[in-house]
């Protein structure tokens, strides 16, 4: 399964990073960071309308290289100027061609919150996200225990961050809710085989109480898709490949927000 492979290479990468910088040193780096002055992501999600999380992504396991020309800073700035509510940055290098320095540089250059899009399997990676400018992390229910979901979310909040707790099945939505998730992501992509079913998020939306913001992820391509998600009561959409392939990124974000 692709997800198992992703977790395996993440463990190898984590061990390498831990050898390069100890957790104690990383904590010191985080402790010295200035206070974050970007808009609060959770408060923004609770405001009316459908919010857009625009993703900076060069490649994926299912599509390979999405774009060869990858001016990541210019892309992120265009998202920011177009009114994106947050910017997701892939930092997974082996399958997504991501890197932590993309996150750090983008976080320094944009006015909106940034999300570290990665496979968080250890508290070290949460401190690492914070040290590189992220104010949002992703916690994937399928790769974490119930205790980890709770502990990692609480650690993120202690560091002044928010966690999107991502589910793909009804059972995972239940686990996300039981863990105390304050933001839930419903993925249309099955991370085990990377197949996409756009209706997945629509089927599971009703499981989440209205007081908890919900983000629809993956397979969102058209204005019609966006309208369906808005009508179903989603608070936000995360869009990656569709934006990365577009030559009119600003116009596309504006159109999605307007039609919603």
Curated annotation (Swiss-Prot):
GO BP term (any one): L-tryptophan biosynthetic process
Pathway: Amino-acid biosynthesis; L-tryptophan biosynthesis; L-tryptophan from chorismate: step 4/5
EC number of this enzyme: 4.1.1.48
InterPro entries the record matches: Aldolase_TIM (IPR013785), Indole-3-glycerol_P_synth (IPR045186), Indole-3-glycerol_P_synth_dom (IPR013798), Indole-3-GlycerolPSynthase_CS (IPR001468), RibuloseP-bd_barrel (IPR011060)
The reaction(s) this protein catalyses: 1-(2-carboxyphenylamino)-1-deoxy-D-ribulose 5-phosphate + H(+) = (1S,2R)-1-C-(indol-3-yl)glycerol 3-phosphate + CO2 + H2O
Superkingdom per UniProt: Bacteria
Alphabetical UniProt keywords: Amino-acid biosynthesis, Aromatic amino acid biosynthesis, Decarboxylase, Lyase, Tryptophan biosynthesis
One GO MF term attached to the UniProt entry: indole-3-glycerol-phosphate synthase activity
UniProt xrefs under HAMAP family: IGPS_B (MF_00134_B)
Protein family (similarity comment): Belongs to the TrpC family.
Protein name: Indole-3-glycerol phosphate synthase
Organism: Lacticaseibacillus casei
């Amino acid at each position: 399964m692709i997800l198992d492979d992703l977790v395996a290479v993440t463990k190898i990468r984590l061990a390498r990073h831990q050898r390069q910088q100890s957790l104690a040193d990383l904590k010191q780096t985080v402790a010295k960071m200035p206070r974050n002055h970007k808009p609060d992501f959770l408060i923004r999600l609770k405001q009316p309308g459908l919010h857009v999380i625009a993703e900076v992504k060069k490649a994926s396991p299912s599509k390979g290289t999405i774009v060869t020309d990858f001016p990541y800073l210019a892309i992120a700035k265009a998202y920011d100027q177009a009114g994106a509510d947050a910017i997701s940055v892939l930092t997974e290098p082996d399958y997504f061609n991501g890197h932590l320095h993309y996150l750090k540089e983008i976080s320094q250059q944009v006015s909106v919150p940034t999300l570290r899009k990665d496979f968080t399997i250890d508290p070290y990676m949460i401190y690492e996200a914070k040290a590189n400018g992220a104010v949002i992390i992703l916690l994937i229910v399928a790769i974490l225990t119930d205790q980890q979901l709770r502990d990692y979310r609480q650690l993120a909040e202690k560091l002044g961050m928010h966690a999107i707790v991502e589910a793909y099945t009804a059972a995972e939505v239940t686990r996300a809710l039981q863990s105390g998730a304050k933001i839930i992501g419903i993925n249309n992509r099955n991370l085990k085989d990377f197949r996409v079913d756009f209706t997945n998020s629509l089927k599971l939306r009703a499981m989440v109480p209205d007081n908890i913001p919900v983000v629809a992820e993956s397979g969102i391509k058209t204005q019609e898709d966006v309208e369906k998600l808005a009508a179903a009561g989603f608070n936000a959409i995360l869009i990656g490949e569709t934006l990365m392939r577009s030559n009119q990124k600003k116009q596309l974000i504006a159109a999605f927000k307007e039609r919603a």
